[in-house]
A protein has these predicted regions:
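Hydrophobic, proline/glycine-rich low-complexity stretches
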Residues: 18-25, 31
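Rieske [2Fe-2S] iron-sulfur-binding domain
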Residues: 28-136, 338-339
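A short, structural micro-pattern
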Residues: 23, 95-96, 106, 243, ...
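C-terminal catalytic domain of Rieske-type non-heme iron oxygenases
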Residues: 59, 117-339
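N-terminal chloroplast transit peptides
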Residues: 3-18
């Protein structure tokens, strides 16, 4: 009976989760190894200005980046005895001043205010969890800021059709050869997937250490979107070789989104191969960044016409559009009304 109620509750959350403010989901805010643990770490979730610092027991405290004394920002303060000290008058900020919670998962920091889930989304495929705990895969991390709203960044990361045009160069995987075996997977109202076979270009084969260049082989691909801010994909070739690209996003302005990218592989695990993968990933991200800079930021036109034209292989995009229909960018006034 308990299991029944648990499943019922989980389904209710998945149905209504896209009406819940973004700040109540776990938002990736940083790659832990990139954060100086001896200094306060400044971050934003939408318009909500926040600051975090690490304590002696390796936990994190977060609060608004605002001293409730004379209103100083706290990012130029310092950490002393697990307190964040305001640089203006030395006011101490501790756990009693906390705003939201921070946890560490998959070598990343995640923040949420009154979270609806106990932990960030797990990335699983064929009963395999892709995380830093899985020693069969090497993991590397990078980040980039894109000049685009988060929903459109999500559409891009799940879109199949733009690769032919945006990623067709020497460091791209795009091809004029059509994909095969497209399938749309709808799991619930907060998670969807798509699978397809993609032509394996010669330049990509070389990077992926596949030296047989004559065959017209295809890779097996699976992409998944987990509302509100996670997408990931696994590319399989040569039976057992897997490359996983996992992106967690957080909006930092209405048309500015920070991407935290995880690169995983079970066959390119040495340092040279990892650096090659990271370099190619940055090239591909740079190609997307150029397109995002070309995107119109006219809100009236977007609200009226965005996604009114459709292409093949966009069933999953149509569902994403429905899921995002009630999404709203996190405004500070809305957050403070619920604080």
């Amino acid at each position: 009976m308990k299991l029944f109620y648990f499943i019922l509750f989980a389904n209710i959350i998945s149905i209504y989760s896209f009406n819940i403010p973004l700040y109540r989901f776990w938002n990736c805010i940083g790659i832990e190894n990139n954060i100086d643990k001896y200094k306060p770490y400044e971050f934003k979730v939408g318009d909500i200005p926040l600051i975090a610092w690490k304590t002696k027991n390796n936990s994190y405290i977060s609060t608004l980046n605002f001293c409730k004394h004379f209103g100083s920002k706290l990012d130029q303060g310092w950490i002393e005895n697990d307190c964040l000290i305001c640089p203006y008058h030395g006011i101490k900020h501790n756990n009693e001043d906390s705003c939201g919670e921070i946890i560490t998962y998959d070598n990343k920091l995640w923040w949420a205010y009154n979270p609806i889930y106990k932990s960030p989304p797990k990335i699983k495929y064929n009963n395999i969890e892709y995380s830093s705990d899985n020693t069969n895969y090497s993991s590397d991390y990078t980040e980039i800021i894109m000049n685009e709203e988060m929903p459109s960044c999500m559409y891009n990361s799940m879109d199949i059709n733009h690769a032919q045009f945006i990623h067709r160069g020497i460091f791209g995987f795009g091809s004029d050869i059509p994909i095969k075996n497209y399938k749309h997977h709808k799991y619930n109202n907060s998670k969807i997937g798509t699978s397809f076979d993609h032509y394996f270009k010669k330049n990509v084969k070389i990077v992926n250490k596949k030296m047989s260049l004559k065959d017209n082989s295809f890779t097996s691909n699976y992409h998944e979107f987990i509302y509100p801010s996670t997408t990931w994909s696994v590319v399989k070739h040569s039976h057992d070789k897997e490359l996983i690209i996992h992106v967690d996003m957080v909006p930092i302005e209405e048309f500015k989104t920070k991407w935290f990218i995880t690169i995983r592989s079970n066959y390119m695990k040495d340092d040279i191969s990892k650096n090659v993968l990271k370099y190619v990933t940055h090239q591909i991200l740079g190609q997307d960044k150029i397109q995002f800079d070309r995107q119109s930021k006219n809100i009236l036109l977007r609200n009226k016409f965005l996604l009114k034209k459709k292409l093949n292989y966009e069933d999953h995009i149509n569902d994403m559009e429905k899921i995002f229909s009630n999404y709203s960018y996190p405004k500070l006034d809305n957050f403070l009304n619920n604080f």
